[in-house]
Amino acid sequence: MEYNFTGSSKPRRTINLSGEVQKPVSALAADARTQREDRRRQKLRNSAATRIQAAYRAYATSKAMRNTFAAEFDRLWQNSQRTPSDWVQLTRCLVMAHSRQPSKLHAHRMAAWANDVCGASLWTKPELHACNVLFFMVARRMIFALQYTPDLDVSDARAMILFLLWLQSDSYTTEEQRRAALYMLRFGLHSAIRQCILTFPKEATEECVALSLRPLVLFPEPTTEFAETLDESASASPRSIFIRSFVSDILTLPHLFYRVPISSVSLFASSFPLLDIMIHVQALGAYYDVVSGDSVLAHNPIHSPFLLGNILTIASRRINTMQSGTDVCHYLQMLATLQNALPTTTFDDHTTTVDPRTKKQIDNLISDQHIRSVLATSTRFAHSTRPALCTFLIATLCAWPVSVRDTLLISLLYAYDKEGSTRSMQIGSLVRELWRGWIRSSFLTRKMAVKEQNPGANVVAMRDALTNTAYAQDWTLFLTMCIVYGRCLVILGDDEFYPRESMDASMPTRNPLTMDELVVLSGLLRNLVFFMHWDNVGMTGDS
C-alpha cells in the first residue's frame, strides 16, 4: 500500500495529463437537459401556485364582499320604514350577496324581498321602471335558486314564482313584459318550473303552470322557426325559444297532468299551442336518424316516452275538430316521429320500462276511438292527408307488438265516414284508393316498372328507387297498400277473390283490385324482390 512507502495515509491525487474528461459529452448534454427541465418545472410550479393563491384570494375576497352585502341587506331589512332609495339599496345588496353555491338562507332573503316588492305600494311608477335592470338580475338569481337550491321551502319558492309572474304582469308595459319573459326563458325559466312541479304538492303548482304559459300571451304569433339553443346567443324568435324550452322541460315531465290541479289542466288545454308543438316535434325528428338511431341534437326530448304520453292526453281530443288537412298532416307526422324515436320495447306490455300510468297514456294512441277519429278525419281531407296517414300507419305497425298490428289492420280494412261510423262499403277500400289515386301514377311505380333490354339498366333503376330519398313518400304509400292488401287476401275466399261469372253482377266484389291491377302490382313486387335478392351481396346461394 502507498502509505507503507511514504508514511502517509492520504490518497495520492490523480493527475490527468492527457486532458480526458471523466464524463462523455452525451452525459453532460443529458445533465444540462435535466437541469433545464427541472428549472422549467419549477417555474410552472411557481406559476401554478401563484394562480391558485390568486384564485383563493379572489374567492376569499368575493366571499367577504358577499357577506358584507348580506349583512347590509339584513341591517336594512330590519327597518320597517323604507324609502324608495332603501328599496334600491336592498335590491343591490340582494344581487351582490348571491353565490354560485345556492343556500336556503339567501333563498329565504329573496323570497322575503319578493313578498314585499310585489305588494309594495310606495313604489312610484318612474322609480319602479328605473329598477328593471336590477329586477332582471334578481329574476336570474331566483331562477338559479329554484333549480339548484336543495330542500327549498315551498313557501319561499312560491314567493319567487309570484315575483317572476309579477314581472310579466300589467304593472309593466307590453314591451317590458316581453323583454322580461325573453330574458327569463333564456336563463332556464321552464327548467326552474319543472323542478318546482316535481317537488311542490299538487295544490301549490297553479302559479307554476300560469308562469310557464304566460309567454304565450306575450308572444301570440305562431311560428315555424326552430331554436337549437336557449342561451343569450340564440337568435331565434321569442316564441320559438318558448316552444323549445316548453317541450324539453315541461312536456317531458312524468305524469304532468296528475301533478297539477284541475284548473291548471283546463288552462293547459285552452292555451296549448298544438300547431307550434307539432311543427317543433317534426323539426326535432330531423335531427334523429331512424335507421342508425343517432341523434345530432344533444338531449333530444323526442326520446322521452313522457312527451308522447303528455301530448296525446291533449292532442288526441282535438283531432276531430281540426279544420284543415295541413293540421291533420302535422298531427300524424308528429305521432310518427315520436313513435320512431322510442324503442319498440316501450310499446310492449311485456318488455316496457315505463310506469303503468304513462303506458296507459301511450295506449290511447292505438285505442279504437283514436284510430277511428284518425281515419275519419283523414277521410275528410283525403286529397292531402293520405301520405301523412301512411307515414303514421307504418310507424305504428313497426313500433307496436303483433297483437296491436292485427287489430289495426282489421280496422284499416273498413272505411269510416266523417262521423267515424262504419260505412257499408266494399272491404279494403283504402287499398283501392291508394292504388288508383296515388301509387299507380307515382314516379316510384314508373321507376320500378321499367323494362329494358339490358338487365343492368333494370338493376340501376331499382337501386335508384330504393335509395333515392325523393321517393320516401311514395314508399310509405306503397308499403301501406301492400300490408293492408296482404291482410285483405287472408280473409277473402276464392269465390270472393275471383268471383264466378254466374254471380249477381249487382253484388260488389270484395276484392279491392281488378285482375289487371293485380297483374301490374305482382310485376312490381316481382321486380322488387328480384333486385333485393340480386343486390344482396351477403345472401348465400341456398337462401
Where are these regions (language model features)?
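Context-dependent free N-terminus signature
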Residues: E2-N4
